Amino acid sequence: MATELTWHDVLADEKQQPYFINTLHTVAGERQSGITVYPPQKDVFNAFRFTELGDVKVVILGQDPYHGPGQAHGLAFSVRPGIAPPPSLVNMYKELEASIPGFVRPPHGYLESWARQGVLLLNTVLTVRAGQAHSHASLGWETFTDKVISLINQYREGVVFLLWGSHAQKKGAIIDPLRHHILKAPHPSPLSAHRGFFGCNHFALTNQWLEQHGEKPIDWTPVLPAESE
């Protein structure tokens, strides 16, 4: 089901909610007090900037942003050009090599080209303190991103949700399996990838589903912006 509505249309009311204003206020206060928060302020909402609501075909849920210097830029699992792909992304590339004919692992980990094709790379928590995983987990971000998932569920149809790990899979409760296609696997992190992420075939199954429903499949080879122009 296509929708002409934009993120701005469907999230305007949510962004006026007291909890959301408090979340932004808390994050801004930390930045102003000298605490390093990732990603930079201008990048916090990049997932929505690069993948408009009406273009969403696939959702990949992450947890919170990378907390190392220069990594996070607002797209789950993605890192800026020039930053080495982190272990979870390396394992995603390994699964792509095993399941997508012709996939060649790139030296970078910048996934904007996925986002531009309709893959919403959504972390459930949108900020983190430097070096402190899950440090912003209780700030209210999950209330906001749960709303985002429910809006996709409501306004789109036939979206493929890739839910990796128990945290992401809990979000399956928000998604109507009769309207959308839900694929679950262990998380691609080195701690769990060998428990069933490797061999899950999710990238190939996603493209198979999209093609069966008249959608263009995803080109899973990440391309840097200069290469795609």
Swiss-Prot record:
| Record-linked SMART domains | UDG, UreE_C
Which is a Gene Ontology cellular component entry for this protein? cytoplasm
In Gene Ontology terms, what is a biological process of this protein?
Answer: base-excision repair, AP site formation via deaminated base removal
Q: Name one Pfam family in it.
A: UDG
Reaction(s) catalyzed by this protein? Hydrolyzes single-stranded DNA or mismatched double-stranded DNA and polynucleotides, releasing free uracil
Q: Give the source's domain of life in one word.
A: Bacteria
Q: Which organism is it from?
A: Salmonella arizonae (strain ATCC BAA-731 / CDC346-86 / RSK2980)
Entries under SUPFAM superfamilies matching the protein: Uracil-DNA glycosylase-like
What's an example of a GO molecular-function annotation for this chain?
A: uracil DNA N-glycosylase activity
Q: What is its EC number?
A: 3.2.2.27
Q: What is this protein called?
A: Uracil-DNA glycosylase
Protein encoded by which gene: ung
Active-site feature positions: D64 (proton acceptor)
User: Could you tell me where this protein is found in the cell?
Assistant: Cytoplasm
